[in-house]
Amino acid sequence: MGCRCCKMIQSYLFDPVQVPSPGFVNEVNNCKLEEDDTVRLKGTQNSEVEVPGSTLHSGSLSKPDSSGSTTGLPCQGSLTQEDSEERPCVEKHGIVNGIRPTATLQSVRSPRPQQVDSVSWASSPWVATIDSAHPAQPFLEGEDYRKQSCMLPTLEGTQMVGHGDSRAPAEALAVADHIPYIPAPDYPQVWSPEVDNVNPEEKDCLFENHSEVEPLPGIHPRVSQQGLSMPFSLKRSWDSLNEAGTTEVLSVYFKEEDPTQPTPVADPGNEREDPHTYNGNKEGAVVDEDAEVAEALAALEAATAGEDADDAD
């Protein structure tokens, strides 16, 4: 089985720390030997462990009971030289039970208890890694310590993700470099300042249309036209327009009633007169239109008077 297993057991006796093996289920972390177990350590190079025959198991290690009973140690008979020679052969292949020695030291220090059979535990190269991370280094020899120091630099380049899934940090950097960059749109946005500054007159066309509408004289806008939901400034503009329209209509009527204005000659038999309508916004235009209408009415009445005279004859 080799000296590493003995050193591991010795480290568990003096300073038990939860150090599971990567990729395996190890239940040896909570293992404690009772006083009746006879353990004899011989040297540091060729140490042996004597365990009573009642604790030997042919299968994997079992989980210790909650009452603190003894747990079988990974021992399958006496340690021979053939077993020690087979162990380096297994380590040269680099793969133990389908798991490569590329897992990191972080997974070795995870506190989750795991199980492992005695053969795979003995042939696993992670025993040296556990010993290097364990505080019981005075029991290590110079040769084993050099092997462990050579193994640690190969593990620093990888990191553990999840359970047994290792990824290199270079892959993460490569993925970060390939993130697609989305350029800014070249077309103007809906509410961008460029669109607002294109034509500021169109922006306020709604309010300008309300302010430019002028009501007819004498006709007050309805409540729906004034709008109960209109802002206060627009309501004031409606009131001012109504007042201006009424004053303008009164001034036009006063000018029409002036005696200096030429009056049409009307037939007493036909006293029909068209009411004057509001056809303009300025006083000069209204007066000119009234004069033209009066002349047209006079000519029409003269023609109708001649026809009436012919009918009388």
From Swiss-Prot:
PANTHER family in alphabetical order: CHROMOSOME 4 OPEN READING FRAME 19
Subunit composition and interactions: Interacts with KEAP1; this interaction prevents the ubiquitination of KEAP1 by TRIM25, thus protecting KEAP1 from degradation. Found in association with PDCD10 and members of the STE20 kinases, such as STK24, STK25, and STK26.
The organism's taxonomic lineage, starting at the top: Eukaryota, Metazoa, Chordata, Craniata, Vertebrata
Protein name (Swiss-Prot/TrEMBL): PDCD10 and GCKIII kinases-associated protein 1
Comp. bias regions, Polar residues: 70-81
Record-listed Phosphothreonine modification sites: 104
Originating organism: Rattus norvegicus
Record field: compositional bias (Low complexity): 58-69
Keywords: Cell membrane, Membrane, Phosphoprotein, Tumor suppressor
UniProt modified residues of type Phosphoserine: 60, 107, 237, 240
GO cellular component, one term: cell periphery
Subcellular location: Cell membrane
Domain of life of the source: Eukaryota
Membrane topology: Peripheral membrane protein
UniProt-listed Pfam families: DUF4699 (PF15770)
Region of interest called Disordered, as start-end residue ranges on this chain: 42-95, 253-288
GO biological process, one term: regulation of cell cycle
Biological function: Acts as a tumor suppressor. Acts as a tumor suppressor for colorectal cancer cell proliferation by targeting KEAP1/USP17/ELK1/CDK6 axis.
Chief site of localization: membrane
Molecular function terms from GO: RNA binding
